[in-house]
Amino acid sequence: MSPEVALNRISPMLSPFISSVVRNGKVGLDATNCLRITDLKSGCTSLTPGPNCDRFKLHIPYAGETLKWDIIFNAQYPELPPDFIFGEDAEFLPDPSALHNLASWNPSNPECLLLVVKELVQQYHQFQCSRLRESSRLMFEYQTLLEEPQYGENMEIYAGKKNNWTGEFSARFLLKLPVDFSNIPTYLLKDVNEDPGEDVALLSVSFEDTEATQVYPKLYLSPRIEHALGGSSALHIPAFPGGGCLIDYVPQVCHLLTNKVQYVIQGYHKRREYIAAFLSHFGTGVVEYDAEGFTKLTLLLMWKDFCFLVHIDLPLFFPRDQPTLTFQSVYHFTNSGQLYSQAQKNYPYSPRWDGNEMAKRAKAYFKTFVPQFQEAAFANGKL
């Protein structure tokens, strides 16, 4: 159900509270998922004119789970705070004295419900942390992370239900990784969606038993960051080592991700340097180039009255990854009607060369390769 459809069914006096939750409500570490509501119902009599829904189920993303709490207002007394039912978390009993926004409920503030939900989620986090005391190993993992503010202040924990047969329970740690994405080139962060939310990397680590014999890590990137780093398949994190600890493993993942970000930033600046060098060396031979991301360059060149194009595609992780050179005849066509071309990656190249050296080496390579390309174009293409 879309937020607009849901809000149209809410009692008008309660609508500002719910609107603030579904339109602006982001609680916890997962900034890519908003709060949402379902199961709208009314406690009013059938004679009450609509819209009159005053109770609903609130879905809250937390530590890779979705908490489903019932929130019950009274449309007849909209100035009163709501009641809460915590669904399957029957053992969760929040401390009323710590719910300041509930105790001093201000119906004139449209964000008062959202503020109460945030306080409840904080208490729910404390409740889940307390459950780890049943396992000395999981408690050790939690306490060592807590001692590091960069991890301890950005962590959510969910302890699963205890197995009645074995007495074991699983647990999941969700951490917001302290990785700086601010210097990623802006062109890479475009066109993902209209409201991308916060740029964030979340590491989920699931312990399937209390002795950490089965541990499954997974990295989640917000859409813009995933796109900027080359897609979901571009980053593979290491398996959790047998006998390892989170306090050792999490920095490894941070280091890996930081290096990946630096590769992308370095690639952008190196591509710009590369294209600037080609503009200098080839001058009017440059037909076009990508002036935003510096990922493409096209040259129109001549060798002994034979004109040809060279399309240069620079990869995201340039200069580590070698550019592709595609030679294209301006005279000859393939059977499908396309200009005859050949792609080349087997040419002199070193990622250690600067842009000027790459341009000089490319010019020398063009002179040696063009004769055989011309011969192939005449042999395989049609005028």
From Swiss-Prot:
Disulfide bonds: none annotated. It holds the Pfam family BRE. Coiled coil: none annotated. One of its GO terms (cellular component) is cytoplasm. Residues 275-364 are annotated as: UEV-like 2. One of its GO terms (biological process) is double-strand break repair. It is found in: Cytoplasm; Nucleus. InterPro entries: BRE. The modification Phosphoserine is found at residue 2. Residues 30-147 are annotated as: UEV-like 1. Transmembrane segments: none annotated. Its main location: cytoplasm. One of its GO terms (molecular function) is polyubiquitin modification-dependent protein binding. The keyword Hydrolase does not apply. The modification N-acetylmethionine is found at residue 1. The keyword DNA damage applies. Keywords: Acetylation, Apoptosis, Cell cycle, Cell division, Chromatin regulator, Cytoplasm, DNA damage, DNA repair, Mitosis, Nucleus, Phosphoprotein, Repeat, Ubl conjugation pathway. Component of the BRCA1-A complex, a complex that specifically recognizes 'Lys-63'-linked ubiquitinated histones H2A and H2AX at DNA lesions sites, leading to target the BRCA1-BARD1 heterodimer to sites of DNA damage at double-strand breaks (DSBs). The BRCA1-A complex also possesses deubiquitinase activity that specifically removes 'Lys-63'-linked ubiquitin on histones H2A and H2AX. Contains 2 ubiquitin-conjugating enzyme family-like (UEV-like) regions. These regions lack the critical Cys residues required for ubiquitination but retain the ability to bind ubiquitin. Component of the ARISC complex, at least composed of UIMC1/RAP80, ABRAXAS1, BRCC3/BRCC36, BABAM2 and BABAM1/NBA1. Component of the BRCA1-A complex, at least composed of BRCA1, BARD1, UIMC1/RAP80, ABRAXAS1, BRCC3/BRCC36, BABAM2 and BABAM1/NBA1. In the BRCA1-A complex, interacts directly with ABRAXAS1, BRCC3/BRCC36 and BABAM1/NBA1. Binds polyubiquitin. Component of the BRISC complex, at least composed of ABRAXAS2, BRCC3/BRCC36, BABAM2 and BABAM1/NBA1. Identified in a complex with SHMT2 and the other subunits of the BRISC complex. Belongs to the BABAM2 family. This is BRISC and BRCA1-A complex member 2. It comes from Bos taurus. The lineage of its organism: Eukaryota, Metazoa, Chordata, Craniata, Vertebrata. The gene is BABAM2.
